[in-house]
A protein has these predicted regions:
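Low-complexity, glycine/proline-biased repetitive segments and flexible coils/loops
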Residues: 1-167
């Protein structure tokens, strides 16, 4: 009768208005075994945003980062993969932190993964278009964690998300 709490880091929404596509892909569960809550981990969703309607690239995005936890190790969601340069790709979402033991609270280890950075998609004259960065993974509220930073659309680091609220 063990109660589990899962935290999911979602990636950026996939959007291509010129094709009428407005959708989002949420995080996916990773494999876990055993009764320990620390082994339950959810990965970040796959980000993806077309910044322009004329895209010569593949349009694929960076994959979502996974979340992981094991034994006494520090618990992090892993970083979303960046998009491919030249393909107008968004970074993948950061992995959500797994349900974690409260013993890690305040240790600085309880953070969701950062979103992957978007990469330059097109350069026309002095204008450069970038894919969006992936969303940061969720932190565990029960362990006092915070969300990961969003990936910068220009390859920089995004602002930290506010700390998650209980529930």
């Amino acid at each position: 009768n063990t109660a589990y709490t899962a935290y999911v880091g979602a990636g950026g929404a996939y959007s291509r208005p010129d094709y009428g596509i407005l959708s989002a892909t949420n995080g996916k569960a990773s494999t876990f075994t055993g009764p320990e809550a620390s082994l339950m981990a959810f990965g970040g969703g796959r980000g993806g945003t077309y910044a322009t309607t004329n895209d010569a690239g593949s349009g694929s995005s960076g994959g979502g980062g996974t979340a992981w936890a094991s034994g006494g190790d520090a618990i992090y969601g892993s970083q979303g993969f960046p998009g491919s340069a030249g393909n107008n790709d968004a970074g993948g979402g950061g992995g959500g932190q797994s349900a974690a033991a409260t013993a890690y609270a305040g240790s600085g280890s309880n953070y969701g993964g950062h979103g992957g950075a978007g990469k330059a998609s097109s350069i026309t004259g002095s204008s450069v278009t970038y894919g969006g960065g992936g969303g940061g993974g969720g932190g565990s509220t029960e362990a006092g964690g915070t969300g990961g930073a969003g990936g910068g659309g220009n390859g920089g680091i995004g602002n930290n998300n506010p700390a998650p609220t209980a529930g």
